[in-house]
Design a protein with these regions (language model features):
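N-terminal small-domain helix-loop-helix segment of the aminotransferase-like
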Residues: 1-76, 83, 133, 262-265, ...
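PLP-dependent enzyme catalytic core of the Aspartate aminotransferase-like
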Residues: 60, 315-318, 325-334, 340-375
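Conserved PLP-anchoring active-site segment centered on the Schiff-base-forming lysine
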Residues: 87-109
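Active-site phosphate-binding strand-loop segment of PLP-dependent enzymes
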Residues: 117, 122-193
């Protein structure tokens, strides 16, 4: 379509740079100055200065027992998610995943031979995990529990009580914790992010983060994994991760020089404050969606809205076809709810990074399209 001259509004993926958000100039300068030192391979787990900066960061926010030997830098958090699931899971193992959940995780779990088992998140409670439903989903095959906080696609930020409940569920059933915290600096209103590892020092916890969202350098592919917990439990998984890290050679060296300066800055947190661009566009997207009847919970973090269009559900059987038809007719690209495991064809995820005028136009056009649409 673009080759034929059509302009596509891409509201399906959260690349801040594509919407005019620029990374901190000081971060780019640090990387540029380090290029002459970057042509060679580095340690399979990453550069020591980058890993030291990660250790210092997590110690400063209260994560106990942070050891540089259990820090892994990767080509984005995505690579490390695949490595971790390969290291932890055996064929037939089950992983409890939030519903809705990011497809990267369900894909990585499946590729590692595991089975994603969704636990419900309660829309009426701001998409907080339903701990009762989670308890029902535990079986003898359950190996791990995935927490995505702030959540993609819902924008939920989990409160302390919920996180303590999740940690207790993992403790009771001796589960490995996977915690995806890549949006931890993009918070709105009075939302506060609590690292799950601070509440579960006695549990084996894999914490994932990176520079793509808050620091607007997704193309750098710079992410990290922190492994915490009792030494007797971390050792076998660290050995597996070490082997996988060695197999890939090493992570991208130039981008690692961005990690230390990034962790010493505020990232995208200022833009998420009231009056900041991220906050204004979150407010606008939520307001316009509700004004046109596409109900959604107001996100408290991250870069997305997970909107309902239930008034048209009776006329829709396939939400992926809906998304494709919206693209063909209106040239608006969004992600259907089924991409996130949502069972009904009544949800769309939109990225809130576009300008205010563009977001308003996109939501109004999508609403008009849905009024007449049927399959």
């Amino acid at each position: 379509m673009e080759r034929s001259g059509k302009r596509i509004l891409r509201l399906h993926t959260a690349d801040p740079v594509a919407f005019g958000f620029q990374p901190p100039e000081s971060l780019l300068l640090d990387v540029h100055r380090s290029l002459a030192d970057s042509p060679g391979y580095c340690h399979p787990q990453g550069l020591t200065p980058a890993r030291r900066a990660i250790v210092q960061h997590y110690r400063s926010i209260g994560v106990p027992r942070v050891d540089i030997d259990n820090v892994y830098v990767g080509n984005g958090a995505s690579e490390l998610i695949f490595m971790a699931t390969q290291a932890v899971l055996e064929d037939g193992d089950e992983v409890l995943v939030p519903l809705p959940s990011h497809p990267l995780w369900t894909g990585a779990i499946t590729m590692a031979g595991g089975t994603p088992v969704p636990y419900q998140c309660d829309e009426q409670a701001g998409w907080q995990p339903d701990l009762v439903d989670l308890a029902r989903k535990v079986t003898p095959r359950t190996k791990a529990l995935l927490v995505i906080n702030p959540n993609n696609p819902t924008g939920a930020v989990y409160d302390r009580t919920t996180l303590l409940g999740l940690a207790e569920a993992a403790r009771r059933h001796r589960l490995v914790l996977f915690t995806d915290e890549v949006h931890d600096k993009i918070l709105f209103d009075d939302a506060a992010h609590i690292p799950l590892a601070t509440l579960a020092p006695d549990l084996l916890c894999f914490t994932f983060n990176g520079l793509s969202k808050a620091y607007r350098v997704g193309g750098f592919r710079a992410g990290w994994l922190l492994l915490t917990g009792p030494l007797r439990r971390t050792t076998p998984f660290a050995e597996a991760l070490n082997a996988l890290a060695a197999l890939r050679g090493c992570p991208n060296v130039p981008a690692q020089h961005a990690i230390a300066p990034a962790l010493g800055s505020s990232g995208g947190s200022a833009m998420a404050l009231p009056g900041g661009r991220l906050a204004e566009q979150r407010d606008l997207a939520w307001q316009v969606l509700n004004d046109v009847g596409m109900r959604c919970v107001k996100p408290r973090g991250a870069l997305y809205v997970f909107a309902s269009h239930r008034r048209t559900e009776a006329r829709i059987a396939d939400d992926r076809r809906l998304a494709l038809d919206l693209l063909r007719q209106e040239h608006i690209l969004v992600a259907p709810g089924s991409d996130f495991g949502w069972p009904a064809p009544d949800r769309l995820r939109l990225v809130t990074l576009a300008s205010s005028d563009t977001l308003t136009d996109a939501v109004i056009r999508t609403s008009r399209f849905l009024e007449e649409y049927q399959q």
